[in-house]
């Protein structure tokens, strides 16, 4: 088996069909499988996954880790057979040539490749967020790899101990990869769409969570503050401080 695609979902019946259809198209030329982890779903997510014929369907009815998404990723990894592991979130749509472009980049000490994630400008708020994402290009911090559409060598995941119980398992993964003197590559010319319809509540909660995750990963307050200022996300710094006060 060459590629195992891990997709984790919690009540994503609005988006998961489009996601799985795009993954199937992208895998058409490859020996691959879809490992689908349905995390305590109470909607039609599981039925839709069955409709699209995922190769391994794991219905997760428990939560033993503090961070359930990280737990789902680890469960998916333990049930994967591929040489390469691809993490594709349930609200992401990938292009047909996704793996054809991503796999050749894995050479030398490059063991992980992440694509550019852009918000689909389908609603007014989505269009605002799509425009805001362009601030990555003018800030001094640049853009870090994201886990929403990634390919990584399975043997490297095994070497670093898989996924850990943290709020931001993708960033945590990149940190541990670098500590092993490997490279995690971000490519802005391979684009995937984030198709979720954004709400103001999701934006606010996302900033709080991002700040808390930065604290948990050992990122300094000054860097979190700089991110808040340059990226116009003031609640990230507040989320960092709130998590710091808890400890």
Where are these regions (language model features)?
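Glycine-rich, basic loop-to-helix element that forms the pyrophosphate-binding segment
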Residues: 62-80
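Acidic donor-binding loop at a coil-to-helix junction in glycosyltransferase catalytic cores
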Residues: 167-175
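Short aromatic/hydrophobic "clamp" motif used to bind/position activated sugar donors
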Residues: 85
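Non-catalytic, C-terminal membrane-associated alpha-helical segments of glycosyltransferases
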Residues: 200-247
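A conserved acidic beta->alpha catalytic loop
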Residues: 38-46
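Conserved donor NDP-sugar-binding/catalytic core segment of glycosyltransferases
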Residues: 93, 97-125
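Short, well-formed alpha-helical segments that are part of the catalytic scaffolds
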Residues: 12-26
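A recurrent flexible, glycine/aromatic-enriched loop bordering the glycosyltransferase active site
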Residues: 119-121, 134-152
């Amino acid at each position: 088996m060459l590629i195992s695609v891990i997709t984790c979902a919690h009540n994503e019946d609005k988006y998961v069909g489009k996601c799985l259809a795009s993954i199937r198209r992208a895998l058409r030329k490859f020996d691959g499988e879809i490992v689908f982890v349905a995390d305590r779903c109470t909607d039609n997510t599981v039925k839709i996954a069955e409709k699209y014929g995922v190769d391994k369907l794991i219905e997760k009815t428990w939560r033993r880790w503090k961070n359930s998404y990280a737990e789902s990723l680890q469960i998916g990894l333990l049930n994967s057979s591929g040489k390469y592991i691809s993490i594709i979130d349930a609200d992401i749509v990938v292009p047909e040539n996704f793996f054809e472009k991503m796999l050749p980049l894995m050479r030398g000490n490059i063991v992980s490749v992440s694509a550019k994630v852009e918000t689909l400008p389908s609603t007014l708020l989505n269009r605002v967020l799509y425009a805001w994402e362009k601030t990555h290009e003018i800030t001094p911090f640049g853009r870090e790899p994201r886990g929403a559409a990634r390919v990584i060598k399975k043997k490297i995941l095994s070497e670093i101990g898989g996924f850990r119980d943290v709020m931001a398992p993708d960033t945590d993964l990149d940190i541990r990869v670098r500590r092993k003197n490997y490279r995690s590559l971000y490519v802005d010319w391979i684009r995937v769409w984030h198709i979720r319809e954004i709400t103001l509540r999701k934006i606010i909660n996302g900033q709080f969570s991002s700040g808390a995750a930065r604290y948990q990963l050992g990122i300094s307050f000054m860097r979190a503050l700089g991110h808040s200022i340059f990226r116009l996300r003031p609640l990230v710094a507040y989320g960092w401080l709130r998590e710091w006060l808890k400890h």
